[in-house]
Amino acid sequence: WEEYNIIXQLGNKGQ
């Protein structure tokens, strides 16, 4: 899903 993709990217930036 596109939404899930964004969440994943945000999580990566958080780390």
Swiss-Prot record:
One of its GO terms (biological process) is defense response to bacterium. Stable from pH 2 to 12. Signal peptide: none annotated. It is found in: Secreted. Keywords: Antibiotic, Antimicrobial, Bacteriocin, Secreted. Its main location: secreted. One of its GO terms (cellular component) is extracellular region. The keyword Membrane does not apply. The keyword Secreted applies. Thermostable. Retains 100% activity after incubaction at 100 degrees Celsius for 30 minutes. Retains 70% activity after incubation at 121 degrees Celsius at high pressure for 30 minutes. Antibacterial activity is lost upon treatment with pronase E and partially with trypsin but not when treated with lysozyme or proteinase K. Bacteriocin active against species of Gram-positive bacterial genera Bacillus, Enterococcus, Lactobacillus, Lactococcus, Micrococcus, Staphylococcus and Streptococcus. Active against L.monocytogenes (MIC=0.53 mg/ml). Has no activity against various Gram-negative species. Has no activity against strains of fungi C.albicans and A.brasiliensis. This is Bacteriocin licheniocin 50.2. It comes from Bacillus licheniformis.
